[in-house]
């Protein structure tokens, strides 16, 4: 990624943050891909641009539910034109917020770590589910399964709702749960009408200077969610997906021990991943 004339204040798995002033920052989505909490050496071309477009679409679509990190400004308001041109599709001028110290994970279907948990315990993150459920089955109701926010390279850990309340306070935990479930429910209904099932997703929240809960980071992208094509969805299977699951599945069968460094991902797997991200963007946003 090209250098810009702002000070970098944070480098995450996928996004880099640059300081504009004490109230605003520039959030830039790179083409980096992380899987199993390891950043892979091979970037996914255009991924940052596609993710930013999907995220921006959802931020606007769900703005009636709660405030978000948008400032209403563009990169051209904060960068010289030559720098803004390079980054305009992958950067957002965002409010500086105090992050809420939990990941807000919402699940509508039984898959991934939730399915593994259910097979062992009959529950997902301590939430009891009916007996005899199958992989990829829709849950009787949407569930909120928070996790801790780990540093880059560490694993997030699932926690109970009670533990979530201990970390961020009971009242805030209840607000986070209610908002996360509402965001997911509304988005899942819309996505289904466009041929995408949103199996599960992760929201990030922050507090502004007045203590108002605000949606931030990225929203309902193939990186923060499991998207399934509705026409290929079948209970009792692990449906194909529009996201990095494609890379994850390849890594799972590669024999890798899930510690850095990751093996080199074949070019065709990268190409198919780009196509999947692009397809998700098209389905969701094209009229």
From Swiss-Prot:
CDD domains: SAICAR_synt_Sc. The keyword Nucleotide-binding applies. PROSITE patterns: SAICAR_SYNTHETASE_1, SAICAR_SYNTHETASE_2. It comes from the Bacteria. Keywords: ATP-binding, Ligase, Nucleotide-binding, Purine biosynthesis. Its EC number is 6.3.2.6. Disulfide bonds: none annotated. One of its GO terms (cellular component) is cytoplasm. Belongs to the SAICAR synthetase family. This is Phosphoribosylaminoimidazole-succinocarboxamide synthase. It comes from Neisseria meningitidis serogroup C (strain 053442).
């Amino acid at each position: 990624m090209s250098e810009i004339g702002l000070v970098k204040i944070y480098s995450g798995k996928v996004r880099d943050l640059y300081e504009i002033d004490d109230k605003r920052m520039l959030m830039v989505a790179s083409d980096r891909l992380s899987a199993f909490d390891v950043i892979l050496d091979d970037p996914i071309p255009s991924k940052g641009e596609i993710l930013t477009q999907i995220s921006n679409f959802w931020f606007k679509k769900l703005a009636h539910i709660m405030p978000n990190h948008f400032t209403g400004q563009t990169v051209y308001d904060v960068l010289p034109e030559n720098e803004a041109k390079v980054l305009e599709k992958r950067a957002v001028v965002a409010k500086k917020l105090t992050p809420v110290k939990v990941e807000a994970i919402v699940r509508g279907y039984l898959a991934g770590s939730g399915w593994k948990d259910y097979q062992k315990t009959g529950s997902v993150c301590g939430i009891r589910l009916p007996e005899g459920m199958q992989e990829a089955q829709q849950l009787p109701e949407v569930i909120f399964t928070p996790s801790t926010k780990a540093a880059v390279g560490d694993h997030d850990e699932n926690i109970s709702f009670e533990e979530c309340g201990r970390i961020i306070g009971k009242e805030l935990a209840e607000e986070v749960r209610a908002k996360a479930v509402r965001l997911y429910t509304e988005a899942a209904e819309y996505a289904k009408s466009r041929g995408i099932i949103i199996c599960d997703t992760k929201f990030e929240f922050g507090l502004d200077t007045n203590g108002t809960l605000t949606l931030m980071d990225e929203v309902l992208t193939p990186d923060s969610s499991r998207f399934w094509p509705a026409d290929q969805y079948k209970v009792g299977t692990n449906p194909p997906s529009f996201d990095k699951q494609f890379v994850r599945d390849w890594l799972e069968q590669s024999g890798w021990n899930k510690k850095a460094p990751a093996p080199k991902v074949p070019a065709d797997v990268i190409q198919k991943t780009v196509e999947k991200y692009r397809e998700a963007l098209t389905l969701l946003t094209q009229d």
